[in-house]
């Protein structure tokens, strides 16, 4: 059984947040506290080390006491750039990734991912959600992967590809379906932030 000490968490806070007017999403208040604090609080009991991927406000993120990793590219290349620098700095066999703007992320995320990863010869496992209409939606930035995939990812990125699902297709992957879709709700616009705050009063 994979123990939590064998898993590092990588919180992805390195995006442009264009739909939020370019504001650094990890530092946007949610019920009075920066979104990054919700991510840390929900992950810290699920894993061993925590890493933060950010490309601005580095001093502020570093004040939380965790290593802050900047993308090696300079053009906000998306979550795979974060995955890459995370694996490069991961000191554990497994890496759990999560965005900074999903303040309700499941507190059993790692545990359920571990069960699925151990159930077969998988390289990685990602989350999916079941909507009220029964439709399954992939949530690929919530992912538990073997940190040994670093070379695979770097080879993929060297081709110029940035799409996360394309990389997954080249690997042995599986998914865990979570019934609580709201747990994966993320904040992309001011309106979504307001709606999520109102729904969680």
Role assignments for model-derived ranges:
Residues 2-161, 166-185, 190-195, 200:
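Nucleotide and nucleotide-moiety/phosphate-recognizing core
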